[in-house]
Amino acid sequence: MMSRPAGDFMEGILAAARQDPVLLDSTPVPALDTPDESGVIDCPIAPKELPDGTMLHGYRVQRTIGSGGFGVTYLAQESLLNRRVVVKESFPDSLCYREEGTLDVCLHDPETGKEGFEWALSNFLREVRLLATLDHPCIAKVYSYFEEHRTAYYVVEFINGISLDKLAAQHARLNQPIPQSSLFGLIVRLLDALDYLHSHKLLHRDIKPDNILITRAGLPVIIDFGAAREAHGDLGTSIVETPGFSPTEQSAPNGNMGPWTDIYAFGATLYYILTGTCLPTCRQRDIYDTAEPLATNPALTALYNPALLATIDRAIMPAPAQRYQSVAEWMQDLAAIRL
């Protein structure tokens, strides 16, 4: 069992963090670029993304906000409750296309593509089931799941905010470093979310700046659980790696992953927003580590308590055993810091 810090201790830190929420403007979440279609189809096809205005199970598509190799993400309006939501569609585009007129998802080759398409749907459903068990203010909530157009969809809470990487870029552009109290509040809130996730025996495995949204109220919210896995399950069968944010064990087929894996990625995220640069990849760091410790960086120690920076340095140690093994360990070190 992974332990959690005592309730009074956690509540005390969270209460202090709430005194100074992370600063941000009201910039809306931008649409992501959509890659071009590839492959030759000898029958009429529609664009990969559903047209704006399409009705899906009581949700009206407003626009596409993301598109990748395994799915499409839409901003939509729920008719019944009159609220904005995010709808994720399973769409492995190397295996399927959208039929013109019906908008149904059809296989390029029904014989060779069926197994891969069913595998993608199975992973999609697994993601829904993982998310549906979670209830934390810093984790996006799942509302519903349905099947339509020969594929599957699930509906997630819409987070009206700005990604952490864009927020950090705004501060850098204005030459306004994130205040220490705001940084501390961000760290504590997200560590609490990770601790909650780990207490449910789940690993996110893809913590990075653009998977954290900051709301207008200053609340950080973790999104995109497509790489999440059960901590006690077989983690080695699926390699998900983001250079500069993923630790060594995540790039190995049988890497020993645990809470320390998400801890590294979160530390790497903090390193990025403080320095404006990504860490070298873990392969590079294993050969020759050029990452300068934050706690000895004069430009940063002039702005932040070196003890706070030292906790981030420990989180991003290349060797898993040298990192914090749990969120509780990191929080204990934070509790001893006087800002």
Which role fits each region the language model picked out?
Residues 101-133:
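AlphaC helix of the eukaryotic protein kinase fold
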Residues 145:
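Activation-segment/catalytic-loop signature of the eukaryotic protein kinase fold
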Residues 149-163, 167:
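Conserved short submotifs of the Hanks-type protein kinase catalytic core
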Residues 164-177:
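AlphaC helix of the protein kinase catalytic domain
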Residues 186-187:
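Activation segment signature within eukaryotic-like protein kinase domains
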Residues 198-214:
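Catalytic-loop of the protein kinase fold
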Residues 236-250:
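Conserved activation segment of eukaryotic-like protein kinases, specifically the C-terminal portion
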